[in-house]
Amino acid sequence: MAAMADKVVVKKTTTRRRGRSNSRSRSRSRSRSRTKKTVKIIEKKPEKSILKKIDQAERRDAKQLRRIRKKVQGPPVNSRMTTVVTLGQITGNKDNTLERKHKCFLNPLLMKSQETGQTATPLSVRASQYNLWKLSRLHVRLIPLAGKANILGSVVFLDLEQEANTAGPESVDTIKARPHVEVPIGSKTVWKVHPRSALGPRQGWWNVDPGDSPTDSLGPALNMWTYLQTVNALQSAGGTQTPYTSALFLVEVLVTYEFSNYGPKPALSQMVSDSFPPASGSTATLKNTSDGAVAIQLSGAIARKMEEVEPKGRRSNAQTSGVGEVFWAVSTEVVNTVADAIPGWGWLLKGGWFVLRKIFGAANDQNGTYLIYSSVADAQGDNRIYTSVKQTQLTSSRINLVQLTQPNVNQAAVGGSVGAANSIYLPLPQADDQYTPYFVYNFQGERVSTTETGVFCLAAIPAATTSSRYNNQITTPSIGYRNASGTGTSFLLDAASWWNILDVTQTGVLFGQPRLGVGVMQTMKTLKQHIKDYTEPAIQKYYPGTTNLDEQLKQRLNLAEGDPVISMGDTNGRRAALFYRTSDEKYILFFSTTEDPGAQYQNLKMLYFWNWSYSDTKQQFLDHLRTVQFANLDDSQPAPYDSDDDDLSDVTSLFEQADLGDETDFKFNMSIQTSKHLEEEKNYWKNQCERMMMEKALSGTSQPLVRFEKAGPRADQSSASGHS
């Protein structure tokens, strides 16, 4: 239409004039024509196209729309970051159930690998500098780590959970009702999640700091699941295929985050995101608190990691009572038998995700007790779960731990630790719980076997009560335990009439054997990490069936079958036993004396107790025992220093070339014979002495004071003058 409107219009017109009559009677002039034709060319101005008018109107409307959006859609984007984050592995499933492998919040502070720990990432550092975030791109990549030809039986699910801060019953149907992707084993997949699925509550924006409002900060979460048992087709045991629990996929995400409202909070970049495999000494046990709330008691590496962020009440600046300020998210695999330990709340454990908050107090600090919540909102309001639970081990599989809040956001972390303060280490019973690599170890942190006698020594000032002293003659006393095959056996104690049950929990320490030279290796608190490690030869399981003690004495000991027991002996060769009573987590030292220790134990003088090998006799125990570290055992006696004097005197050395070796200095070796400066110094003083002696001789002295003779090959020739 625009082309047609711009055409030039040519208009042809013919003008006819009324002529005269064609009468022949009138002559016709040659100068006059009969008909006059004219052609007019009219060029019209091109009219505006209708489409151009529409385009102008659209541009005007878009400009007005942008102005309106600036008013209603929040702050502008101040920073944008695109990066790839490796979230971790998806492993195989050992049962025919739905197992959660990980739950990763889309908050950029929490978008970390499962093994990052407390290390800052580029994304978390950028996010800690702003107050608002939103996600404009999310591509999830699954890289296969196992082939589909050999690994069979399972399917992997990924889903995006909008209401991620609340736990709920989970099944395959609930996963498929959300935005999800289903991936068979061995397939490389890229899942492109639409950004509208991650819009925040404030015109698409979320808060960065979860401590402000966790429900408005954490955002959606990416869940990773494995459904049905994973088996290895190439392996079988007893006719059945072996479950495959190793890695199936590596999960990576390509993300683009937008940030706004600059406000740096350095400590947010180093919130904990860690994974803890099952290990000896690490436990997670369900229990009830004193008010009946459901809690979990943690020990081992996961408890130490949480206490680094939230220290115990023994520190000068630490919380001493109430509920902690840090929220923790735990995701793990929970079997159905364990889920039944919480009546009515089994779905919470089956879902494999819940929130924890530490409960402070003297008893809770010692045990590492954390309250369980079903959502972040319940944790924020301290809405506890009240039901009677069975005290049972929660899980024996990997536990993923994520720190959701950070109370002190403006304290920059130093050396990978957020909010670390100077701890009170002394007195030793009040020292912070520390990590020790093994039961007995050397300076390199290497394990030292406890098979031999005298590998470690117990020293303590024990605590006693009125029931600690027991008087009755026992002729063949013994302590029963189960050996490696599970058979009940025992080790004998000395026959005696006085028996002592002393508590060494507070003051007991373990020394390494003298040849190690490590000194104190464990307190009774750190020993809890290893006291249930029955792979150590020194630690056995108590068995009352083969224990020969008075029944009243057994009742006072109050031991349960399976409690750890260690064979000990003092330096006099009197055998004893060290028990760890699991009912109240006390260390009990049990031994006999030949005389009454006294009503208040005023007559007892404590000795050191050393570990006694179960296969050693009393004489072998005493022969192996070493109580002094002899440092120069392999050193030879140093040779006496030879201080032979030189034949030349100090004065003569100024004039003669002494046969001296190279003398070692702190920077270099200097040769006296070849030193130019020393040669000049010697000649100067020689000339001075010659001049002084000559002046003295010429002053009238009858006898020469000094006779100078030449050295060298001509030394045997006498001087002609007798004087220089």
Swiss-Prot record:
Residues 423-629 are annotated as: P2 globular domain. InterPro entries: Astro_capsid_N, Viral_coat, VP90_C. Residues 13-39 have a biased composition (Basic residues). Pfam families: Astro_capsid_N, Astro_capsid_p2. It comes from the Viruses. Gene3D superfamilies: 2.60.120.20. GO terms for cellular component: T=1 icosahedral viral capsid. Residues 630-724 are annotated as: Acidic. Residues 1-39, 700-724 are annotated as: Disordered. One of its GO terms (biological process) is symbiont-mediated suppression of host complement activation. It is found in: Virion. The keyword Magnesium does not apply. Specific enzymatic cleavages by the host yield mature proteins. Keywords: Capsid protein, Host-virus interaction, Inhibition of host complement factors by virus, T=1 icosahedral capsid protein, Viral immunoevasion, Virion. The keyword Manganese does not apply. Self-assembles to form an icosahedral T=3 immature capsid. Contains the P2 globular region. Belongs to the astroviridae capsid polyprotein family. This is Capsid polyprotein VP90. The lineage of its organism: Viruses, Riboviria, Orthornavirae, Pisuviricota, Stelpaviricetes.
